[in-house]
Amino acid sequence: MAKIGLFFGSDTGTTRKIAKQIKDMFDDEVMAKPLNVNRADVADFMAYDFLILGTPTLGDGQLPGLSANAASESWEEFLPRIADQDFSGKTIALFGLGDQVTYPLEFVNALFFLHEFFSDRGAKLVGRWPAKGYGFEDSLAVVEGEFLGLALDQDNQAALTPERLKGWLSLIAADFGLVLPA
């Protein structure tokens, strides 16, 4: 079994594409194939001590899900299914997608909600990312000048994504026991 679980929620498919880009950097022994949380069950999720989780931000800065007018179930519906799980001993890194131009007041807010959920259940969260180089006005996901995970804007800064992904994976490598490809 792979060492790292890679799960995502998505509405338009962009978060899935980023998850696939992350997976493509590692072989199957290191990282599992990305799995949409709308297809995951509790056992899938709890099988890993290391998790990389991705989410877009929808609506008014919400996690994706039916109440945010997502096309299908997502994080909003999955989190209650794992709410009684103990995440002590698990290391989690988050990445989030948002549009800082159209939604400058809630850019990648969904990162905050995932961070809070897993932190409250004992997980070790790693992978904070500098908030410099972005053009948003406000975000719940920024604490002391850093995002609570990797923030990506595929609508306005897609050209920066490969560099940001590589930098972020280097940042979390030690916590995940990863050796990055050259």
From Swiss-Prot:
Gene3D superfamilies: 3.40.50.360. InterPro entries: Flavdoxin-like, Flavodoxin, Flavodoxin/NO_synth, Flavodoxin_CS, Flavodoxin_lc, Flavoprotein-like_sf. GO terms for molecular function: electron transfer activity; FMN binding. Its cofactor is FMN. It comes from the Bacteria. Residues 4-173 form the Flavodoxin-like domain. Transmembrane segments: none annotated. Keywords: Electron transport, Flavoprotein, FMN, Nitrogen fixation, Transport. One of its GO terms (biological process) is nitrogen fixation. It holds the Pfam family Flavodoxin_1. Low-potential electron donor to a number of redox enzymes. NifF is the electron donor to nitrogenase. Belongs to the flavodoxin family. NCBIfam families: flav_long (TIGR01752), PRK09267.1-5 (NF006739). This is Flavodoxin. It comes from Rhodobacter capsulatus (strain ATCC BAA-309 / NBRC 16581 / SB1003). The lineage of its organism: Bacteria, Pseudomonadati, Pseudomonadota, Alphaproteobacteria, Rhodobacterales. The gene is nifF.
